[in-house]
Amino acid sequence: MTETVAIIVAGGRGQRAGAERPKQWQMLLGKRVIDWSIAAFVDHPQISQVVIVAGDELGDCSAEPKIIQAKPGNTRTQSVLSGLAAATISEDATVVIHDAARPGIDAATISSLIARLQDPSVSGAAPAMPVADALKTNSGQSWTNVDRTGLVRVQTPQAFRLGEIRAALSAAGPDLVDDLTAIEAAGGRVEIVSGSARLTKITYPEDFDMLARLLSPTGAPRIGKGYDVHEFEAGDHVTLCGVAIPHIAKLKGHSDADAAWHALTDAILGAVALGDIGDHFPPSDPQWKGADSGLFLKEAQRLAEAKGYVIANCDITVICEAPKVKPHREAMRARTAELLGLPLDAVSVKATTTEGLGFTGRREGIAAEAVALLMPKG
C-alpha cells in the first residue's frame, strides 16, 4: 500500500474565535484543540508520518517518532508547502492535509480519504456536508435566494498525491479557497466523501461549546474537592505545590506537609470516589516519612486514569497570613502543571487570608482547598 503522511496546518492566528491565543492552542475538553488532530493521525495505522506546521507554541514532540515539525509560512499555502517539503516520502505517496482548528477528525474519515486515492484517476478527495440552511445573496439593492441543489460545505482533511498537490499549490494564485481548489484548477479529478458536523472548523467563540458537546465521550464529568491543614513547627521554609518558600517556620507533617498538593490529591481521589489521601498513604506507614507529595499527586492521577478519567483543570486556594504566596504563585502553577502534564492555563493557584480569624489568622498553620474537574477519556 502507498505510504501516507498527514500534514496538520497550525500557523493561523484565529482572530475571529474571540481570544488572545489562536484557537488551535486553546483548550477543548481538557486538551489543546490541536492535540485532538495529532492523536487521531498518530494513532491511525495507515499514517506513517505526521508533519505539524507550527511555531514554538507546539512544544517538544520528540518523544513521538511519527511527528516531524515544520515552520509555518506567511500564508496558508506557504505553510502547506513547508509541510510538504518536510515530509520524507516519495512523489506518488499520499498526503492528507488537515486544519488544526478542526478537532473532530476520526479514523473512519481518514481511511475513506486514503482509499479514494488508491484510484489512479483520482487526484484529490475531501469530506463535505450538504448545505442545510437557506442561502441568500445581496446584489446591493435586495436579497435573492440561492438554489442549494448540489451545494456542499467542504471540510478537511483533504487527500492528494505529494507531487501533484505540490505542483498545484506552487502554481496557485493568492486567492486560493482550499487545497482541493488548486488540484481542480490543475485539471485533476476530485471526489467527495461523507463529511460530519464533528469536522466543523472552529471560527467563532460559540464553536467551542458546539464541538465540546459533539466530542464529549460517553459519561459525565466528575468534580472533586479537597481540603488540608498543617500546623507550623520550627524550620526555615514551607513547601507548597512542590515549591520551597522561605519562612520562619515549616509545616509539620509525616510527609513534606505540602498542604496544597495534599488538597489537590484529595480532590482528584474524591472525583472518582476512591477515598482520600490517608487511605492510600497512611501517616502510620514509615515509607511515607518525609515523602515528596508529588508522589501522592501522581498516584492519584494514575488511579483516576485507571478508572477512565483525565484531569481537565484544577484550582487551588492557599489560606494563610504568612508566608506571602503571591510572589511564588506562578512557580507553583508551573510545577503543578509540569507534574500532571497539563497546560499551564489548566492550573490555577490563589491565596487568601481569614482576616486574622481562626488558627490561620493566629499564624499557627496553613490550610488549602482544591477543586478538580475530571473528564472521561476521549
UniProtKB/Swiss-Prot annotation:
Its cofactor is a divalent metal cation. The keyword Plastid does not apply. Keywords: Isoprene biosynthesis, Lyase, Metal-binding, Multifunctional enzyme, Nucleotidyltransferase, Transferase. A divalent metal cation binds at residues 228, 230, 262. PANTHER family: 2-C-METHYL-D-ERYTHRITOL 2,4-CYCLODIPHOSPHATE SYNTHASE, CHLOROPLASTIC. In the N-terminal section; belongs to the IspD/TarI cytidylyltransferase family. IspD subfamily. In the C-terminal section; belongs to the IspF family. HAMAP family: IspDF, IspF. This is Bifunctional enzyme IspD/IspF. It comes from Hyphomonas neptunium (strain ATCC 15444).
